Curated annotation (Swiss-Prot):
UniProt protein name: Protein farnesyltransferase/geranylgeranyltransferase type-1 subunit alpha
Record text on subunit structure and interactions: Heterodimer of FNTA and FNTB (farnesyltransferase). Heterodimer of FNTA and PGGT1B (geranylgeranyltransferase).
Species annotation: Homo sapiens
Top enzyme class: transferase
Biased composition (Pro residues): 19-32
Activity modulation comment: Activated by the AGRIN-induced phosphorylation which is mediated by MUSK.
Region Disordered: start-end pairs: 1-54
Cellular compartments per GO CC: CAAX-protein geranylgeranyltransferase complex; cytoplasm; cytosol; microtubule associated complex; plasma membrane; protein farnesyltransferase complex
Positions of modified residues (N-acetylalanine): 2
Amino acid sequence: MAATEGVGEAAQGGEPGQPAQPPPQPHPPPPQQQHKEEMAAEAGEAVASPMDDGFVSLDSPSYVLYRDRAEWADIDPVPQNDGPNPVVQIIYSDKFRDVYDYFRAVLQRDERSERAFKLTRDAIELNAANYTVWHFRRVLLKSLQKDLHEEMNYITAIIEEQPKNYQVWHHRRVLVEWLRDPSQELEFIADILNQDAKNYHAWQHRQWVIQEFKLWDNELQYVDQLLKEDVRNNSVWNQRYFVISNTTGYNDRAVLEREVQYTLEMIKLVPHNESAWNYLKGILQDRGLSKYPNLLNQLLDLQPSHSSPYLIAFLVDIYEDMLENQCDNKEDILNKALELCEILAKEKDTIRKEYWRYIGRSLQSKHSTENDSPTNVQQ
């Protein structure tokens, strides 16, 4: 693929591959730009940084298309190549086409200059999901020895506007890797999660930061706080599992008992929400649901006052685990499981009645005796 491909409005994905041929040497800044900077220096004027407030937004009335700028006269814009017979061709705005035609040109030349860096900002303003622009911007950050702390401020502002964009979070991650400074990250992510506590981009970044820089301290307390605010948030339950799995683990009986009882208390608050039930099943399933001491009795005690499809389904899972492990009273346990499957099918989870009847038939087929097959599951 040519270096200029994949930079249209809809381009997304991972980092672009290395070119087949060695890249050309970076072009120096054009004479017009160099002369302008020299004149400004002689006059004692500061040359504006691309991150200065003086940056002209594309929405500004004073914005000038690149093709009309004298300092870009040395560049031949490279149009997007949609092939000889494009189908359903995207109609780009004149401004979008202008910016990306010039971006393709500097990318093709591998021009590592201040003007190319400023151009990436315009391209990002038009489409912050374009991975090629972000990649080239990072090349320029290194080549031009830009202030990475300023770049962190820049990406912070963009993420606050577009918090569900893969490319902006990846750019931030690379900056944190370069700086080896995670000091702002947990607070920043918490601010983003305050806007949407289920933003998986933010959670993914948080997990990476914590794991990369060993920031495990206080994370479980943070999770506790979020669960108190919204016990239904499956993302927070996932974070709880992530933290404990990577710290104490669940093999310590005291940790496991704490988590089981913690989860049961949360279930009492919202018995009809699946998140806590999934967590409970996740931490016990590999150990055997029926083998955890007194869990069955605790759930049976909950059933009269906190009955829900999830509680009954969990009981079915426990009974199935008992059957798989060759329990003594096999026929009695099987009948209890079949009865619960029928309750789910007829009363508690009717939208999945065929599923529960299938589960019942499967249990019956696998675990009933040949001479005395239970008949309380409808066909």
